[in-house]
Design a protein with these regions (language model features):
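Activation segment/activation loop of eukaryotic-type protein kinase catalytic domains
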Residues: 1-25
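Conserved activation segment of eukaryotic-like protein kinases, specifically the C-terminal portion
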Residues: 21-35
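Conserved end of the kinase activation segment
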Residues: 35-45
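Hydrophobic anchor on a C-lobe helix of Hanks-type protein kinase catalytic domains
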Residues: 58-59
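Conserved C-terminal C-lobe helix
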Residues: 85-98
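Terminal C-lobe "cap" of eukaryotic-type protein kinase domains
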Residues: 100-104, 108-124
Length: 130
């Protein structure tokens, strides 16, 4: 599955430092803690947060944050149905993506190398489905 939204895309010179943003583009349910606090933010850590929220929806069917205050504080609440099994390594990846401190939050290299994702496509189909 690939999800892409180019609504706020800009061309960035890779030799220049990544810019900070002050305007928010998107849906608040997926907005990073620093964005909700109206702090200047960098796009890569904010996008990793969004990935964490998306993982919660895909794995549990629910948002990891009951309220905006919970999102700002990084208080994750996993509402998992008894019939749903979320692998511990998947939950660990989601929590790394949802760290309220953008400096401590996982980066794309950590996500890409995470044990839950590495080798997943080598598994038989029935083992890839949660």
């Amino acid at each position: 599955m690939k999800l892409v939204d180019f609504g706020s895309a800009v061309v960035v010179d890779p030799s220049e430092p990544r810019p900070s943003y002050t305007l928010f583009f998107g849906t608040t349910a997926y907005a990073a803690s620093e964005v909700l606090q109206k702090k200047p933010y960098r796009a890569p850590p904010a996008e990793i947060w969004t990935l964490g929220v998306l993982l919660s929806y895909l794995l549990t069917g629910a948002s990891p944050f009951p309220t905006e205050r919970d999102a700002i504080a990084g208080r994750v609440s996993l509402a998992v149905h008894a019939s749903v099994h979320v692998p511990e390594s998947a939950e660990q990846l989601m929590m790394r993506c949802l760290d309220p401190d953008p400096e401590r939050r996982a980066n794309i290299h950590e996500v890409h190398a995470h044990p839950w994702l590495v080798g997943a496509m080598d598994l038989p189909l029935e083992e890839r489905i949660l």
